Amino acid sequence: IKEYFESVGIEVIDKRDRGGCLWIVGERTDISKYVNEAVTRFKISGAYGAGHATGHRNGWYTKSNK
């Protein structure tokens, strides 16, 4: 998943090795096309939000280990 988002030029923050999430940083309107494709392609789930990991910037996150 990480490589997919990086390949389309989206900032990725990966905290899964410390029990966190994989964050995709961006406004929902800008990243939803890629998120929807990843959800379908990799059969993952996640949610939109903002958190400490992103410096409280908007994005989408998943706990998937794919």
What residue spans do the PLM features occupy?
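Accessory DNA-engaging acidic/polar modules
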Residues: 1-66
